[in-house]
Amino acid sequence: MHNKLYLFILSLFVAISAAAQNIEITVKLGNEPAEYAFIFKNGCCLGNCDSLGRFEFQAGAIERGDSLMASVAGLSSDVVVYDGNARSVTLNVKSGELAGAKVVEKNLKRVDEYVSLVNSVPFEWRVFGRRFLCEYVIGEDSEISRKTADFTILDNYGKRYSKDKGDVLIYSFGNNIDDEKVGYDIFSSYVILGKILNRHSERLKDECTSGRMLVHKLSDDAGISYLLIDKSGDNSQILVRFGYRKELLDVCLEGNRNEEYGLEHYVWKITIAQNRKGPVRISGIELHGNMIATGKPKDVLVSEINDSPLTKADWKELKMAFVR
């Protein structure tokens, strides 16, 4: 009996000692925790924080001289060099570019992330074709005008709005902004969706290749990417990449929490300067293309894709869901 008690106390002591050696990283965006911010050690992304902005390194996983940085919504913290002794480190993400934006749609559980456009007009990025309300600001200092818009994200199959005829996403405001023209310059943006789901890749591959969810097709240096809308009712969005030999490269999902696949709610966004050339890669995913915002409401262009297995009924359902 005494031996069992001794072993229990010893194991408890070892567990407490091991936990005490862990290093906790806290990421803040202003005075608030930066939900699901990404943590970088020596330039490599190790994962993301929890909903309280916390990330924990196991004992020995970080050493003196390692550089730490956090990133969320295209914004980054200053680089902090670990001194080898601290048990906790706080990384502060600069939030100056995010002022003034707030999503007011009632069924959103939280404001995920913002993308800062040119002229510092932030907005919330959501699923293609989904409408929601967004507060935004235009102007600077005393000339700031705060508006609330019915905001729709549209895709552009026709490529008619792109100067270089590349893939373009159209962001369109609705009619409830007093017909004011709200437009921005074309800017480069790489939108990275989801979290790599290798453990579910084969299961999703069967659904994706059946074409039941196929909506958008992208080409890049790695092969073909398919952007899919899950028609099961949870408004999810899946990005699947296949190589030239039709081998599966990546599977990612953005949308509501999906218990069936055990998926968290992730949206990765990176906005880069116009003069940036080459793809941005995060965890093996990359997208190429430009985006433009326009003040004129436009329809989603849902067009046939070559060799698409979608039936006429599928296309009819897609058009009813996305064409306004």
Specify the residue positions occupied by each region the protein language model found:
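Surface-exposed, low-complexity/disordered segments
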Residues: 87-227, 232-233, 239-324
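Structural motif
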Residues: 21-35
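Bacterial N-terminal signal peptides
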Residues: 7-17
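Short, acidic Ser/Thr/Gly-rich low-complexity loop/linker segments typical of extracellular
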Residues: 44-56
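Short amphipathic beta-strand segments in non-cytosolic proteins
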Residues: 30-31, 37-47, 73, 103-108
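Short Pro-Gly-centered beta-turn/loop motif in secreted/extracellular proteins
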Residues: 56-65
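A short, solvent-exposed loop/turn motif at the edges and junctions
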Residues: 69-81
